[in-house]
């Protein structure tokens, strides 16, 4: 994944930019540019492909980009790839406004997406900086080494937060327990089985109530799941032998 990603908020327009390899712009088997498929076709992601898929992805179904497009007044996609700058735009829930075109040259790589939510689809289109920043910080903990910059450029609300953690889940533990009495340093480990990577960290404190934060594909699973059930069993087994 890219080493840096930024999210800007101005005039209630979201702008997300990264320094990755840039979304693919070559022709898809369906006869349209791949970037267009990403933003107009459900389940078009490659997160479950074992060859050429994503190493890191968010969510499960591969619908994020196309759903954002469907629920936006307009979307503008800019891609820096192979020495060229590409741009494509949509409006009114995904209608193509301008075809993918080359608008310049570049010596960098990455993608930038700007969009404005369709106010007819939501009760409010005013964004909470706190919620966006909180999610960005979680991502930074889970994707160690990635720098996330969140900026609010709305008049009278200007602020910026930068999140960057080289120690990932260890840093997450330290953040969660910074005002608590702990009994040891955070313990972190990871493993791979059947192409599924699992990362885990834990730390015992003087609190009676346990707190478990579980994620799948960097999305919080507040309702738990088999991954959380397995973690609870393993920590209880560890406690019984302590």
Model-based region annotation:
Residues 1, 106-110, 195:
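Short, solvent-exposed loop/turn segments at the edges of secondary structure
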Residues 1-6, 237-241:
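Short, small-residue-biased leader/transition segments that mark boundaries at the very start
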Residues 3, 109-111, 221, 235:
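Ser/Thr-centric signal marking residues that sit
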Residues 9-10, 104-114, 202-217:
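Flexible hinge/switch segments at interdomain interfaces of large molecular machines
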Residues 10-34, 45-175:
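GHKL-type ATPase core
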Residues 38:
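Short basic (Lys/Arg) and small-residue
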Residues 43, 61, 227, 241:
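Histidine-centered active-site/metal-ligand motif
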Residues 97, 130, 137-139, 145, ...:
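GHKL/Histidine-kinase-like ATPase module
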């Amino acid at each position: 994944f890219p080493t840096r990603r930024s999210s800007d908020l101005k005039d209630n327009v979201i702008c997300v930019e990264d320094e990755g390899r840039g979304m693919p712009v070559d022709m898809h088997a369906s006869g349209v540019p791949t970037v267009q498929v990403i933003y107009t076709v459900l389940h078009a992601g490659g997160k479950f492909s074992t060859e050429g898929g994503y190493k890191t992805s968010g969510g499960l179904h591969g619908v994020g980009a196309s759903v954002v497009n469907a629920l936006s007044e307009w979307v503008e996609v800019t891609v820096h790839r192979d020495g060229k700058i590409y741009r494509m735009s949509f409006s009114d829930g995904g209608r193509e406004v301008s075809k993918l075109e080359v608008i310049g040259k570049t010596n960098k790589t990455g993608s930038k997406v700007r969009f404005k939510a369709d106010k007819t689809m939501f009760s409010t289109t005013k964004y909470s900086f706190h919620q966006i920043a909180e999610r960005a910080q979680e991502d930074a903990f889970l994707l160690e080494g990635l720098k996330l910059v969140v900026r609010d450029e709305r008049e009278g609300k200007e602020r910026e937060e930068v999140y960057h953690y080289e120690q990932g889940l260890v840093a997450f533990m330290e953040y969660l327990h910074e005002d608590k009495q702990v009994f040891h340093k955070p313990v972190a480990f990871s493993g791979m089985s059947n192409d599924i990577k699992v990362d885990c960290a834990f730390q015992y404190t003087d609190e009676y109530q346990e707190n478990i934060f579980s994620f799948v594909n960097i999305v919080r699973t507040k309702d738990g799941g088999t991954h959380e059930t397995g973690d609870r069993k393993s920590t209880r087994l560890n406690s019984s032998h302590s």
